[in-house]
UniProtKB/Swiss-Prot annotation:
GO terms for molecular function: ATP binding; ATP hydrolysis activity. ATP binds at residues 251-258, 588-595. It comes from Chlamydia muridarum (strain MoPn / Nigg). Residues 168-189 have a biased composition (Low complexity). Residues 97-161 are annotated as: Repeat 2. CDD domains: AAA, RecA-like_ClpB_Hsp104-like. It holds the Pfam family Clp_N. Residues 18-161 form the Clp R domain. Keywords: ATP-binding, Chaperone, Nucleotide-binding, Repeat. This is Probable ATP-dependent Clp protease ATP-binding subunit. PANTHER family: ATP-DEPENDENT CLP PROTEASE, HEAT SHOCK PROTEIN 104. GO terms for cellular component: cytoplasm. It comes from the Bacteria. One of its GO terms (biological process) is cellular response to heat.
Amino acid sequence: MSYMLKSIPPRHIQVFMFEKFTNRAKQVIKLAKKEAQRLNHNYLGTEHILLGLLKLGQGVAVNVLRTLGVDFDTAKNEVERLIGYGPEIQVYGDPALTGRVKKSFESANEEASILEHNYVGTEHLLLGILNQADGVALQVLENLHIDPKEIRKEILKELETFNLQLPPSSSITPRNTNSSSSSSSKSSSLGGHSLGGDKPEKLSALKAYGYDLTEMFKEARLDPVIGRSAEVERLILILCRRRKNNPVLIGEAGVGKTAIVEGLAQKIVSGEVPEALRKKRLITLDLALMIAGTKYRGQFEERIKAVMDEVRKHGNILLFIDELHTIVGAGAAEGAIDASHILKPALARGEIQCIGATTLDEYRKHIEKDAALERRFQKIVVQPPSVDETVEILRGLKKKYEEHHNVFITDEALVAAAKLSDQYVHGRFLPDKAIDLLDEAGARVRVNTMGQPSELLRLEAEIESTKQAKEQAIGTQEYEKAASLRDEEKKLREKLSNMKQQWESNKEEHQVPVDEEAVAQVVSVQTGIPAARLTEAESEKLLMLENTLQKKVIGQDQAVASICRAIRRSRTGIKDPNRPMGSFLFLGPTGVGKTLLAQQIAVEMFGGEDSLIQVDMSEYMEKFAATKMMGSPPGYVGHEEGGHLTEQVRRRPYCVVLFDEIEKAHPDIMDLMLQILEQGRLTDSFGRKIDFRNTIIIMTSNLGADLIRKTGEIGFGLRSHMDYGVIKEKIDAAVKKHLKPEFINRLDESVIFKPLEKEALSEIIHLEINKLGSRLQNHQMALNIPDSVVSFLVDKGHSPEMGARPLRRVVEQYLEDPLAEMLLKESCRQEARKLCARLIEERVIFEREDEISALAVEGDGPASVTADES
């Protein structure tokens, strides 16, 4: 190479050198020139090339240097320390190449030739400057405690990994062993330096595209596998068969299919397997990694063929393909075959053993359609574990999560994670959802306790304040004050360092516990149920429920008592857990509190009125309207939108579902509710089972309400309990006449609401007045309504046929309308603080305490204010 350069005219030497340089290598030269100009150097040395390589930020050389801990800033500081800046002179043109740089370029070309590369890249440039024993770049690396031999080893590894992604030459294909060995022998002594052996170990296809589970378990990188002994035993039996010894684990996502395979790896490592499996290696094949980067036809087939050849060669390899359905169609291009067709002959002959894992749906869609592929695999159906088995699994994983989050997990938290996830987290399966609850609970506790103590924060603020005062003193040339502040800052920093060390040690010693409350908070975030309601004693909460409802739903104590009894039966576990928490039919006249009671149940049981899903059954008067509830069938308009009811329950599975006025719906539509009431589920148009087990089903109806109005014995009060019993029998008869027996039998209870008595209406008026008073507080006003006015409002608003709703209009007409006019008056807005109401000849008069101001309201006309009245 030196002779060739001498025979070339000097003006053409650089052109010859850069002829094979890649774009990145040329960019390195440009960056190196800029670094030379920055340092005021009129030459380009090996140190500038090193800085150019690091500043480029990409390429094999940069990856290797970063792996060894060398970055641009570190190298730049070392170069500046060694050679410093040049004199401040104007440099015209490009800096001249030093002799060492020219030799390094020659060496880079030689390295590329040795590696049989027809280009010079950043890796060759790095090897070239390493060959200059007296170069500044090599001295910089040695000062940074970097061994050149390590750089060469890392470059070789990087190049071998890269070669696996190119069309094979091939280092992994057995048919090309001659070219592979010759290439290896040439690259074993790059630049005349040994790489730690006569021949470098080639990167195998299995190592490139897979992960050795048995090796990972030896290194304690896998979680322990608890239980699943039956599935692991069946897996071992299938693997020990002579033919068709390829098991496939089929189960829903999250039931632990991959964990079963890891359990097999655990048994292989511990020797708890038959002799035929004792020396086996279990390797997970990453199919996505194998497909990635295959730009040319035949590359994918070569890679998978190399894996199969290596499995045949070793003879002790068990392949595990997670998401087995991905092999169908994987790598198939125009004129090519997919992975499943490549694997099928070897699987049939027993040349390779493969363990698959996939879900039930994916197995049906992809594997079962290919009968030849299906018969080569033996199915193992994996069912979700029970709650007790999940608790044992969590106990086995407890230590791993304690170490990760640096917390202490109580046994109560493990039990709560299993039970609460099974009860409240739907659409997913144990043990995955229980593990996720425990993991998030540990993260929540850890994050909440990571904050620094207030004393540390105060000390840091004091240090910052002292530092600013010191800088200000330096700026004003008060050097004695600055020196004093410097000493004070030093003391504060020492104190801060000691406090931080003590805090860190205390944090490590005193682990924060993860208890049942922490798990309940995670469930609360995921489901919307207040955590306090989950952890509160059930007996206390259910005893409080009846009293709370009676305070808000007036005059229906018997109905409230009936629904509370049914809820107690459900929540104490006496009822069937596969049915809804409660299903009720509310009967009675309008305006007596049926919908209000449903709203209050939503508030008390689920924390808010937004947990009430209200379905107006008058929208389902036609038979075909049933599709609106659960979604249109496939092929019909609106299929992708889903059902109005099913989609709402999917998004909020913990709610009160109110079917209003069910007698207006088509009778056939009521048949849809049979499976909701009996089995606690409804299948939507997509085939998904919507869970109603954590809902309270309430239906309202006015059936038999006319009987209450026609009964002369019942006015605003019942004469005796027998009178109410007679009416109940008549209403029950009307319900049985209109609704089917199979529907009525599935209800927990039919609740009949009584007409409101006068005392109940008086309490309702007081509730409305209290609401009005709370709204007036925003205007700094207080309201005083005497009993005489309340009695007047009750007399004006009561109606046995209309219930309590007329009371709202009475309050608006006699109280809210005149108050609104008073608020609009400037004098009232500024001065009024407390308003008193008086009843004068069926007029409600409002007066201020400091100055009498009356506002008369005619019972049959709009509110008005006159000077005489005030």
